[in-house]
Amino acid sequence: TEKEVKVYSGRHYNTDRSVYKKFAEETGIKVRLIEAAGISLIERLKREGKNSQADLILLVDAARITNAAKAGLLQRIESSNLENDVPVGLKDPNKEWYALTRRVRVMVANPKVVDVSKINDYTDLADPSLKGKVCLRNRKSPYNQSLVANQILNKGESETKAWLSGMISNVSQPFFPGDISIVRAVSKRKCGIGIVNHYYVARMLAGINGRRDALYAKRTTVLTPNPAHVNISAGGVAKYATNKNEAIK
């Protein structure tokens, strides 16, 4: 019987597919992939219960993979490779999930619209001088939700609430559906600064999205706060996986 691993993934990147292809070629294990939004995958796993076909769960956002573990959707993983390769703080103490990638929430600015020398932290986006110059994703974005949670942890609820109020009052137009659209808007001077995951800018600069997006990205300046908010994507073995060893591999 042909070996296989069924992957439920909340990641939607062509680079992942190239990894699956290489994995299949090197191991002989066929990868069967189901992609959907992270919340949808968690709900699907709950619904399927013991009848679930999932072996490996890949989710974007630390909160989502933690919630999956708390919901009893994952199982303990015994892997010396993962234990040795993944640093402390980027893995579950109960060994139910391990971070696979990190993503930094950076600010991307147009130096022709805003004075980048005066912007050092996320909190600076609440400054009245940026009125009508800030671009943001809508509040459903897990990246922004986690950023806000991180700010509450570091600066307290009242200070975070004041920051959010000030920043939102500086928003230039309706909220954006994705990070790439924010980089484009900043480049076109539709706004002066926005918050995005660092790799979107890197992908655009590399020309992965085409020459036009590469030009858009080159017109912007990336500002990384210190400390910066770093989120993860992570993987775990499904509670009722029938191909556990293949999933760990």
Question: What is each of the regions a protein language model found here?
Answer:
Residues 8-11, 74-83, 93-94, 96-98, 109-111, 117, 123-126, 211-229, ...:
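Short beta-strand->loop
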Residues 139, 143, 150-222:
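Ligand-binding pocket segment of bilobal, Venus flytrap-like solute-binding proteins
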Residues 106-113, 149, 231-244:
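A bilobed periplasmic-binding-protein/Venus flytrap-type ligand-binding module shared by bacterial periplasmic
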Residues 29, 48-57, 73, 130-132, ...:
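Alpha-to-beta junction loops
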Residues 121-129, 234-249:
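Bilobed periplasmic-binding protein/Venus flytrap-like ligand-binding cleft at the lobe interface
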Residues 1-67:
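Early extracytoplasmic/lumenal segment of secretory-pathway proteins
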Residues 52-57, 75-107, 123, 133-136:
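A structural signal for short loop-to-beta-strand junctions that line the ligand-binding cleft
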